[in-house]
């Protein structure tokens, strides 16, 4: 119906005399209100997170503590010899977390603040999208358009409650410092840039947007090649579709697609000198023979997530959002909606389709690769909401107007008081939640070490939280099931010249042979909460463990040229 309706007439504004300072103050107040609303939503998300089992994934998972471990390594002046995954985390994860940890004391607090910054960053990008899609709308309307999808994502996050990483509870996973929040923000951030590149009022604006696209693609792909699948290829496909439908001329269509593809290529080439920091090359993910397994995995993941009432609500919302985005994009193309509306809708739809096809076609089995299914519909909601408001007067015969300034001031005052009270309560709740208190097991280990110069060893999922939350005396090396060193999301510098005298175990510690069979009986056994410490100091087990780790680490370091 929307494309059949006439555009709303441009509103006739009658301005009372006001100084430039007063207008600037009003504009700033509106923008700050949007940020404050986003912060309140973020506090709601994080309050729920720290009280649910998701706190385990957020605070203590082996992957989730990567940024605290990197920050500690930099703070202690270690050489940067980190073995990352295919993701380098150089833009923006490491700089952002290090900056936050510099001013925010404690790992728990730094991770929470980082999550809040991530939500505000997402709002800022959506606010920019609203500004270029419906530039003539009032600030209040554009702020509301950007806040609405953030509120919808907040609702989804409140439905997420399990302590498992491998589910489709991706909104809370997005808030961690490890699971691709930077790539997700870059993907959404490409949308306002492509709108300006195609529909900018001046040639300078269009050229600036193209430069921005190249820079964004290069930086994002350098850090995480997933950006090419999530954004670069979808933009190129969308540009082609709009050109075929005569919604774009050839020049901007080619320029947009080329900007992102060239930027992605530049970013990928820039990764070549960083090869020694990359543990897994892209070819490792090309498992076409696992397509059937991939389909089963994602279908099972969907229904497993939907097996509780909270998950059923979230998965229903996801299904509606994804199918709605795809349907609206098709309608926009078919009905020749304005380019500034059609282009971001089609890019969002292409991102969803390309992501699903690539995830299955490459035989992947990782839910985090499906982030576009949550965040591209959120961006599409801004675009469709703006277009609906633009056409609403023709649909209803009524002009949609904001209430009078007096009513708005009173409503804002009430909202500020309510949000402030709720925010204070949320901060207190997070500060006193069990999940944010001192990690007792790490404290126990630190107390047992007692300042001695000791080094331990443990499996990836066992030892990383102890290292992140322990004091500087806690140094634990990662080992495989065969008691050999493993370089994966850790610093090779840790393995140099270490005598390994204790082993950390928990319920997730699985070895090919028991520690007693390989290392002999420990000198003593210490229990620290869920962990068991086998102390081999002064025994033959210390020599055996040290030798195996030293030899295997030296081989891996030489192989990686670290």
Model region roles, listed by residue range:
Residues 31-38, 211, 261-262, 388-428:
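Signature aromatic-anchored transmembrane alpha helix within multi-pass, membrane-resident enzymes
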Residues 40, 113-146, 152-154, 189:
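Transmembrane-helix motifs of polytopic, lipid-linked glycan transferases
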Residues 60, 137-198, 365-377, 460-461:
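Membrane-interface micro-motifs in multi-pass membrane enzymes
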Residues 66-72, 83-109, 290-305:
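Short hydrophobic/aromatic helix or loop-helix immediately within or flanking a transmembrane segment
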Residues 178-186, 229-230, 310-320, 342-346, ...:
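Hydrophobic/aromatic-rich transmembrane helices and adjacent perimembrane loops
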Residues 202-206, 243-255, 322-350, 361-363:
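Membrane-interface helix-loop-helix junctions at transmembrane boundaries of multi-pass membrane enzymes
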Residues 207-225, 233-236:
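Membrane-interface alpha helices of multi-pass inner-membrane proteins
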Residues 450-487:
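Short periplasmic/luminal acceptor-recognition loop of GT-C membrane glycosyltransferases, typified by
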